[in-house]
Amino acid sequence: KKVFCSRSLFELLGIQETDEDYTYLELEGFAKMMQVLGNGIRESEDVSLYQISREHSIQYLRLKIVKAENGYQTGVLLDVTEEVEKQQRLERERDYDQLTDLYNRGAFRRSTEALLGSGKLSCAALIMWDLDNLKYVNDTYGHEMGDRYIRLFADQLKRLSSLGAVVERHSGDEFMAFLCGDSEEQIREEIRQFFCSVRDVSLKVDEDYELPLRASAGVTWYPRQARDFASLTRYADFAMYMAKHSTK
C-alpha cells in the first residue's frame, strides 16, 4: 500500500522530501515520517492537535482523518498555530491577574473545586492573606510603589506554587492559596517556612528606608473543618480577620 502525499505536507512537517507537487510513500515510510508529530491531543474521534518544537518557536498542527465508504482514508494537516496562540492568549487574559501573574478568583475557584471533587485529597489547607500596610504605602509613596508591594508578595506566593499549591490574587490586597499534602503537620511546616521566608523580605521605598513585607493570614483545613470551597473560604476569611485585628 502507498500513501499519496502533497508537497505542503512535507513543508508543514519541516521535511525537504520532494520538489514535486505530490509523491507516493510506502505505508511504513509514511508512518515513520509522521512520528515527528509525537503524541497529539485528541480533540474528537477523527481530529488530533499536535505541538512541534521548532528552533525558535512552537508550531501547532491539526490532523483530521476522513474515512471514505470505499475504505480509503484521507488526512488533512493544517497549521493552526495562530488560532491556538490566540486561544491561549484569551484563556490567559480570562484566568490570570495582570498585575501579579497569579490566578484570578474565577480560575482559582475552578482549579480548587476540581481538586476538591477529585476524591484524591487526604488533607489540604486553604490560606487567605491580607497585606498589611498597603494603604500606608499607597498614601505615602504612591500607587506605583503600592503595586510593587503587591507584586513583591505575589512573587513570594509563587514559591508555594512550586510545592503544588494553587495561588491567586483574590482582590486588591487579598491573596489565597490551596495547599495539599499528606497530613496537617506536613502542611503546617510548609506554611511556617513560607512565613519565615516572607519575614526576610522588604521593599526599598527610598534611599534610606526599606519597608518589611507583612501580611495577616487565616487558615482553614480540609476535611477537618470544611469540605466545600465556599465554607473553606468563609472560615479562612474569618480566621484572617481575627488574626489581623488581634495584632492591632
Q: Which residue stretches match the model-derived regions?
A:
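N-terminal capping loop/helix in small sensory signaling domains highlighted by a polar->aromatic N-x2-3-F motif
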Residues: 3-13
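Conserved long alpha-helical elements within nucleotide-processing catalytic cores of c-di-GMP signaling
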Residues: 11, 91-95, 102-125, 132-162, ...
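Terminal output helix/cap of sensory domains in signal transduction proteins
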Residues: 13, 20-53, 116-117
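Per-ARNT-Sim (PAS) sensory domains and their PAS-associated C-terminal
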Residues: 41-61, 71, 209-211
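Signal-transducing coiled-coil linker helices
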Residues: 60-98, 106-116, 166
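Output-coupling edge of small sensory domains
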Residues: 64-68, 201, 220
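Cyclic nucleotide signaling catalytic output domains
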Residues: 167, 193, 216-224, 231-247
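Catalytic core regions of nucleotide second-messenger enzymes
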Residues: 169-170, 187, 198-215, 244
